[in-house]
């Protein structure tokens, strides 16, 4: 949500928006847009209604919006854009899908679900067998497994409809170098991904993807840490830092992704041992939490 707020704040002339959520989960730069802070300037209910009616963009997590059903009594929304929709299970969306405005209309006129079912699914602890749906009525509407998102269920319906125009694919991407995109493009997207042709995508890089083997950590009890890998990551971070020199930017140049939080701590410890202060500030995080972020080198 912070990423969306950052993008909205960068638009000129400035776009008015209200963020639904708590200060604890909101970047300090965007706290002035929080619903509570915006309405604190209102002196009476009439001013609250006017302020909320005048603001055309509301931003928040699914949980934050769903936890404020009173919002839909005061405001009718023409469109809701649900980002990362393939990571959201149907029950999590139900409150918003069923929201009603005070006159009985749907609280939201239209939904646009944006996501990629080829990437990270929703985090579910049950196995496929435990979450499988056996009820024939539910299976007839395409609900075969409770681990599936509404996005994926509707997408399957789209594949069955010959002339359905409810689904489209964004084929042009500006993040990955073609060499990085090659494997997922071939294996998951039927070769449909195209590079925008931005400067970083046109660079003549010998090997935009490198695989560096590492030895197993025999001292790791949980199997969720590997000191050998952490040392390799730290050394690579130092190499990138020295390569970029004065152009190295903490929030843009380098990021590290690893599956487990315990490995994050180990990697940070190895990086700190290098004695390069700038590297202590780089983002080291899990796959789930890195969604939506971007760096020159991962």
Model-derived features: where do they sit?
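A substrate-engagement module of RecA-like helicase motors
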Residues: 2-57, 68
